[in-house]
């Protein structure tokens, strides 16, 4: 199967989706990864410098899964924007996945919610969309859990690549 994971920010795939993706890769699925925004709002450094740092952290964190696509949409500014939707649609059409994993529509973060709605609107009628758990389960009602115990240490290593984000706070999610 071709699996596409779409995270709103650099580090989202590692925090919310990595365990499942690692299991899917181990069973032989083809993994494709996309980061929607540039991550420029995720710290106190100058925005251009932070974008470069977060991109390097993401490439490192995801290196055992796949090379990510960076859509470079503006962090904190996803909205009902045709250009944003077109970038996501073009990526989905290019990859033509059998399944998409993204954020839940009720996630705590507006970029996560908007991205989830984009993905569902663009592909939800013909591609199964799986929604990841939200931060500490807030507003999330799961209908299935995946045990990631066997890959947890690898997930932790991936999350810890994001030093600019003080990753210790995300390791056990």
Regions found by a protein language model. Give the residues of each.
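Metal-dependent de-N-acetylase/amidase catalytic core
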Residues: 1-4, 23, 45, 79-173
């Amino acid at each position: 199967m071709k699996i596409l994971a779409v995270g709103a920010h650099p580090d989202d795939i590692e925090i919310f989706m990595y365990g499942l993706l690692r299991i899917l890769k181990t069973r032989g699925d083809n993994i494709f990864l996309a980061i929607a925004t540039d991550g420029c709002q995720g710290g106190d450094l100058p925005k251009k410098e932070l974008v470069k740092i977060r991109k390097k952290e993401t490439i490192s964190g995801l290196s055992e899964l796949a090379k990510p696509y960076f859509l470079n949409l503006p962090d904190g500014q996803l909205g009902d924007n045709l250009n944003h939707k077109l970038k996501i649609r073009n990526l989905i059409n290019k990859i033509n996945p059998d399944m998409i994993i993204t954020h839940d529509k009720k996630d705590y973060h507006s970029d996560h919610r908007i991205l989830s709605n984009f993905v569902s609107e663009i592909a939800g009628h013909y591609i199964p969309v799986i929604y990841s758990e939200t931060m500490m389960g807030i507003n999330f009602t799961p209908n299935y859990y995946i045990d990631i115990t066997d890959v947890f240490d690898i997930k932790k290593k991936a999350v810890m690549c994001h030093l600019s984000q003080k990753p210790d706070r995300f390791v056990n999610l």
